[in-house]
């Protein structure tokens, strides 16, 4: 056989290593979430008088989670540079970013209110927030559904039975 990756019969092992790398470092850049959090903060500041105090907590949570995600990716990258590998913990990151993406876009739509659905006001880039919100539903599905990731976490990280 030509162009064989790994040994004979190791295809699943190679596929899982590739998927772990994809989930752990490649699929979603931390900068993407940091930029979205910054835009969300600006959206909040532009509409602060229309927002409830609870909305401020959502903005702080989005910012803190985007920074947490960046730190976890930096940790994973430094682990790899030191000769380590991406393990099953990449499943934690995949669930984290997919839920963070949805939460940030959902928060933006709450700030914009019903008018976001009725007009494409360029001042607030409502159309971009709506598009991002709709796309955020794909995150928990692609790169292995979040349900599958939870099973991986339970079995491989927590040692729970299948």
Predicted regions and their residues:
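Short glycine-/small-residue-rich flexible loop motifs, especially phosphate/cofactor-binding loops
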Residues: 41, 106, 151-152
């Amino acid at each position: 056989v030509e162009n064989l990756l790994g040994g004979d019969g190791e295809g699943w092992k190679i596929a899982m290593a590739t998927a772990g790398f994809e989930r752990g470092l490649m699929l979603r850049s931390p900068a993407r979430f940091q930029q979205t959090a910054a835009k969300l903060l600006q959206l909040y500041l532009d509409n602060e008088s229309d927002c409830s105090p609870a909305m401020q907590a959502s903005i702080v949570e989005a910012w803190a989670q985007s920074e947490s995600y960046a730190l976890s990716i930096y940790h994973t990258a430094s682990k790899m540079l030191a000769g380590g590998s991406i393990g099953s913990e990449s499943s934690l990151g995949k669930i984290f970013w997919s839920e963070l993406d949805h939460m940030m876009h959902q928060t933006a739509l709450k700030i914009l209110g019903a008018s976001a659905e009725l007009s494409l006001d360029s001042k607030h880039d409502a159309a971009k927030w709506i598009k991002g919100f709709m796309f955020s539903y794909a995150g928990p599905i692609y790169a292995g559904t979040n349900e599958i990731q939870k099973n991986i976490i339970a079995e491989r990280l927590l040692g729970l039975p299948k």
